[in-house]
Amino acid sequence: MKQIIQKYDQPGTWEVVLPFTKVGQEQTWTGIIDARQPGVYELTVVATHTAQGTRGRITVRAVCGAGARVAVRGLIRIAKEAQDTEDFLELRILTLGKTALATAEPELEIEANQVKASHAASVGPVDEEQLLYLMSRGLGRAEAVDTIVRGFLA
């Protein structure tokens, strides 16, 4: 299976198009957005399945720091002729600070009737229990947050 990982760590706007045009084509795509610097980070990912029996998995993980705005949109499009296709879209954004703004918008457009396609999305702050646990092991708050962020983006 073809695997692609792309990282974004500067403000900007990106569009990624993933065409699935060959019968049985398989691909995994992962996008990592490190938006700990202020600015606007916008990512759109579109997977278009036009061949039968294709398999995909799209994952976006983002960290949104204070003063940053992250907008992630993902779309899985499955054409009528792309029967027996499977794809999963996952968008996860971790917010750091009260001024971090983030949105995750997963979408499915399915014209075929023999497919497996789904999505998941979440936007939220660092889990306070995880922070307290790491701090009880001797880490300072900033170091604990950094440890959680590194694990989340890995």
Predicted feature residues:
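Conserved beta-strand/loop scaffold segments within soluble protein domains that form the structured core
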Residues: 1-139, 149-154
